[in-house]
Amino acid sequence: MRLSQVGELGLLAELERRGLAQRIEDDAAQLGDGLVVTQDALVEGVHFRFDLVSWRELGFRAAAVNLSDLAASGAEPEALVVTLAVPTETDVEDVLELYAGLNEPGVPIVGGDTTRAELVALSVTALGRSERVPGRGGARPGDLLVVTGPLGASGAAFRENRLARPPLRLVEGRELARHAHALLDISDGLAVDAGHIAARSGVRCVIDLERVPLASGAELDDVGFGEDFELLAAVVDPSGFAEIGRCEAGEGVALLLDGRPYELGGWDHFRRA
């Protein structure tokens, strides 16, 4: 069986089944005493191209996608650890620009590694502390589904041959974490990520697509592209965040447009969902 057949989630399930990794349920791992840790990698030709992004923007993006996982954990960031693989002919000034971007969010870089590679690859580990991590598995029938901002920016940018700048939702994440029953960031597309809440919580997520706020220039199908890095939460009180749906008894995700079923795509690292 190949990765293209099972996808990322299938691989994770097989690792868990064989006892090779603990069950991976949330955006960041909880290590006790409120410490949470997450890691994401960006690989040239897979996640970015230098005709679409500068070295500085790449650095910011690498920090931001990891901080998004901390935001989904209601965490206050404390440190970043950075591993960089680059060709030997890379200009030193380009690497300095990359690190300038990594430093933009204001989280200290406390360690890492640098090594040689044919293409650029960047892996960031982010550490933070959270008083309460809602996770993905606590949503209940009757909960409302809310998002922290407009969706579709990344998909719209891709259609225009560019990359969107990820938002930082750390403040919103800490606010939502105080009372949300489930919380995650939208990195794989709205339908896919709502499906994570539905599967872990044992509920059916019903999303009214006409209520989903769209980013400037975005079309509805862009919401399925992923990499918006807004937060999706299941709550009792929307607290001013955009309400886009609800949780019901049942399973799976129902996407409705004017009351009729609608399909959105989503992202899987080894296949399109």
Give names to the regions the model predicted.
Residues 1-54, 73, 78, 82, ...:
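Extreme N-terminal cap/leader segments of soluble proteins
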Residues 3, 7, 33, 166-167, ...:
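Acidic, Ser/Thr/Pro-rich beta/coil linker or hinge segments at domain junctions
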Residues 23, 36-39, 108-112, 126, ...:
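General beta-strand structural signal in soluble alpha/beta enzymes
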Residues 42, 76-155:
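Glycine-rich anion-binding loops of enzyme active sites
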Residues 55-79, 96-104, 171, 175, ...:
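Small-aliphatic-rich amphipathic alpha-helix that forms the alpha element of a beta-alpha
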Residues 89-91, 164-228:
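Active-site-proximal betaalpha loop/short-helix elements
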Residues 124-135, 159-175:
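Active-site glycine-rich loop that binds ribose-phosphate moieties when present
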